[in-house]
Amino acid sequence: MVLVQTGSSMPEPLYKSWIDAYHKEAASTQVRYMPVGSAESARNILAGSGDLGGGDAPIPETQLHAANKSVLELPAVLIGIVAIYELPGIKGELKLTGPVLANIFLGRIKTWNDSALTRLNPDMNLPALPIRVFHRTDGKGSNYILSDYLCKVSPEFLAIAGRSESPKWPAGQSFQRSQELVNQLHSTPGAIGYTELNLAVSSGVRMASIKNAAGEFVKPSSQSIAAAASAGGGKKNEDFRVSLTNAPGKESYPISSFTWLYVPAVAPDPERGRAVAAYLKWVYTSGQKIAQEQGYATLPADVLAKVAAKASTVH
């Protein structure tokens, strides 16, 4: 049997590792992954297309109600969105606050030696270089996570761009896929953009530390992302749609999130439903171990137990 899964391009490397490993254990089931983006994946699942979907944002309530269909939104792993930049020959680690990052993406801070940046980074010899803003195209989960955070720390960003998979960016160049953005940033002095932590690490791009809700500058890492999940209220929330951005706690990385699997509670075909349930059972056991080995922050134990229990109801 071939199961069709759509979803975000950010966790694609992990999902492909899962799919390969699962096929070795369950040879009769293949999973085909199509990285169509979070918004498109949600539309597909609500329309009855595909066996499971996924994305880096909760499905909008209006779409869920309009579809009149029971879809489970199950956290798969934790991810962090990191601010990445290209400043050749400039030593040091860039520090940013949420409001400063918001003003960069609003096009209000235009050069790297702007006083808002030099105040935060007195030890970096920031150049009089134009800032080139890179962002993702519409319908992307990374847009949602970043804009969710920026809307919490910047009233101006909330008013102008908004919290969305398709923010109204007033400035910058857009990219369809995360890897395209990273590749272009590498070869563009003065560029700033964002991507998922593991892709940033594997690509060797520089990442900024972000000031969190407790006033600490925190580097993105699987540990600081896990700290945000532990502090961010995911434990208490049974529907798993909770936002983890700007979480409390000194060690919390502030642009952290679940990435979700969108799963029809009842499959149109019982045999396919059983196959999806078996795959999910594997994801929340062996799959979590693989995610940890690949450097992802896995679900806290109490959240994992609740998610696995919910996943077992799929049929």
What would you call each of these model-derived segments?
Residues M1-H315:
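Flexible loop/hinge segments at secondary-structure junctions
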